[in-house]
Amino acid sequence: MKKGMTLNEYQEKAMQTCMPSCDNISYMLLNLVGEVGELASKIAKDIRKGNAFIENNELCFARQVGCGEILERIEEYKKEAGDILWQLFGFYTAMGWKANDVAVGNLDKLADRASRGKIDGDGDNR
């Protein structure tokens, strides 16, 4: 991906790798959930094995894990995050949405909430 690429440009390029099943909204949504689960599972397994822990909202690695291994794990997490991004944008495409429109709409919603002091709370329409 080139520097300065827009969300829509990424979406267009990434979706060139789609198979016909990418048009299926249910399939894309369920795979998105699956990809998020894969990332969570990798981190959970590192925690279970004592190789990682979360402290003060940061993912930390145990002393016995060498620097090279830490870098490998971080790269694996990043690859999974990339799969999540691809799947999310695939879902957008199946829905007929442009990624930039989704992002701008979300920022507008957040700015409106902030202007009314409603960032914290429950529900989309607060």
Regions found by a protein language model. Name each.
Residues 1-126:
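Flexible "arm" and connector segments at domain edges
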